[in-house]
Amino acid sequence: MKNPLYVDYHDHERWIPNFDDQYLFEMLILESFQAGLSRECVLNKRENFKKAYDNFDIKKVCNYDENKISELMKNPWIIRNRLKIKASINNAKIFKNIVNEFWNFYEYLKTFTNWGITHETWKTTNKRSDNISKDLQKRWMRFVWNVIIYSYLQAIGVINSHEDGCFLN
């Protein structure tokens, strides 16, 4: 890890529990954009995503229209994938519905079995990520496959994957 953004993310954010709805939404969007790309690629563009996505304001993202999609597609500082951009808007609406249903997104996540922070290394999925992914897809979220959800659970601090020897383990 030589990229200072990646080191800072590893040391101060990833695998550290944070259950604020705006943060949970931001991480869900960023993890979805990471599909097929490296984490470093997304981290390098994170601040630009924040600007382009109105600081990941859920209400604003829910109201994005074709003009905003065109604006995002022209933004050279973010990942310009039309399917992912449209999915992010769709997912914002579903995220908001889940928050309305469960009071907050963390409460929704807690409804899945074996809740709590777990320590796992060298995995890319588990039963929890499989179940959450299936449920989100039933709700019509996109780019939320089990591997993405597993990475998301790592990002928000539910799965701690620091390896032996890491000072954060």
Question: For each predicted feature, which ranges?
Answer:
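HhH-family (HhH-GPD) DNA N-glycosylase catalytic core used in base-excision repair
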Residues: 1-169
